[in-house]
Amino acid sequence: MSTDLGTAEEMETRELVHFVTQQTRFALINNILQHPEQLPSMYELEELNPSVSDATVYKHIQKLIDAGIVKEVALDDDQRRQGYPWKFYGLTDEGRAFLEEHNLLAAEETLQQIYDTISDKPEKMVKYENAPRPGDV
């Protein structure tokens, strides 16, 4: 069915573009893209968004998971280490493809370069950044 607004599929696509480009969600997607492993922990996402409450970061990550853009990945029980994160957040293959298709990954390399220049990361963030990730072992 086609309307003045386009087909139902086009409308869904526009809604999803609008959804992922909402300020907080798009910032979180960019945080994932700029992370060295593209798998930050919740703590890292919270630290990278100091003007947003931890609860809001969590809520928007959950919305991105529900939409199929982001996935939660966890270390196996035998790989977990006390004092280190074991849950991480990354783009799904479908999420990456959608962002690529709509030219929302254009700044990926620049984001990674900017992240590399952050020199005043809290010690805990550096520790978490270097924590083992699924697939490392």
Task: Label every model-predicted segment.
Residues S2-N30:
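Short alpha-helical segments that sit at the start of domains
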Residues V17-T24, L75-E101:
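Short, cationic-aromatic polyanion-contact patches
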Residues Q38-L48:
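Short acidic, hydrophobic short linear motifs in intrinsically disordered regions
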Residues L39, V70-E72, G90:
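Short beta-strand(s) of the beta-wing in winged-helix/HTH DNA-binding folds
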Residues V52-Y58:
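Short coil turns linking two alpha-helices in DNA-binding domains
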Residues Y58-Q62, R80:
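Short, hydrophobic-biased segments on the C-terminal half of alpha helices
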Residues I65-D77:
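A short, conserved structural fragment
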Residues D93-V137:
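Amphipathic alpha-helical dimerization/coiled-coil segments
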